[in-house]
A protein has these predicted regions:
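Active-site-adjacent helical/loop segments in soluble small-molecule enzymes
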Residues: 112-158, 180
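Short glycine/serine/threonine-rich phosphate/pyrophosphate-binding segments
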Residues: 60-71, 143-151, 174
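Short acidic, glycine/serine/threonine-rich loops at helix termini
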Residues: 38-40, 69-73, 95-99, 175-179
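Phosphate-binding loop/pocket of nucleotide- and phosphate-handling active sites
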Residues: 152-197
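Residues at the starts of beta-strands that form the adenosine-phosphate
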Residues: 80-82, 162
């Protein structure tokens, strides 16, 4: 068991220790080369096929797999595509994403592959998650709200071009949080301190 104060970093450390002590296999998505390979062969290949004009690619900084695999394939498609990581502000957790300032850098993450990191706060992620549902009918989770908020920031600074962002978590995980119905301050506190599924 881990103390809640150690968050997902503590859980990863305990899982690695238990696997090592007991001779168990741990898929370890943060360090497994199959993770970025799946995005190289799948996610990015779909983007190249369906949106070859992409100029900017935005994904949340979680395990690093989406960013690493997609960036490699997209830069092969066109070297000038910008790859941007959406990262939560330190001390302002966004469910599903991780701040590198919290001390854990996924082994598969190569920061040199990123053109930029943009920070996003939990409140902005929640507000965009609500907008996605209300305005676009997209029932996404908070990390997806963070990514689309980042996409909007990037697009606002562009005079032309195409931004692609990854909506990777579902709203069903947050049904008990009151994300779409309760006061934003109350939801922000619940999302900061909870696991919903």
């Amino acid at each position: 068991q881990t103390e809640g104060e150690f968050g997902s970093n503590g859980a990863v450390e305990v899982a690695q220790r238990l696997a090592a002590e007991n001779g168990l296999y741990m898929p370890f998505q943060y360090g497994n080369p199959a993770n970025p390979r799946a995005h190289y062969e799948g996610t990015a290949e779909e983007i190249v096929r369906d949106c070859p004009e992409v100029d900017v690619f935005v994904a949340g900084l979680g395990t690093g797999g989406t960013l690493m695999g997609s960036s490699r394939r997209l830069k092969e498609h066109r070297a000038d595509i910008r790859v941007i990581a959406c990262e939560p502000l330190q001390g302002d957790p966004v469910s599903g994403l991780r701040s590198l300032d919290d001390g854990f850098v996924p082994p598969i993450l190569d920061l040199a592959r990123l053109d930029r990191k943009l920070l996003v706060g939990n409140r902005d992620a929640i507000l965009m998650t609500r907008r996605l549902a209300a305005e676009e009918g997209i029932f996404a989770g908070v990390s997806s709200g963070a990514v689309i908020h980042t996409c909007a920031r990037v697009a606002a600074r562009m005079t032309r071009g195409t931004v692609v962002g990854i909506v990777c978590d579902g709203g069903w995980k947050y049904l008990s949080s009151g994300l779409w119905t309760d006061d934003v301050d109350a939801v922000e506190d619940r999302v900061d301190n909870g696991i919903f599924w």
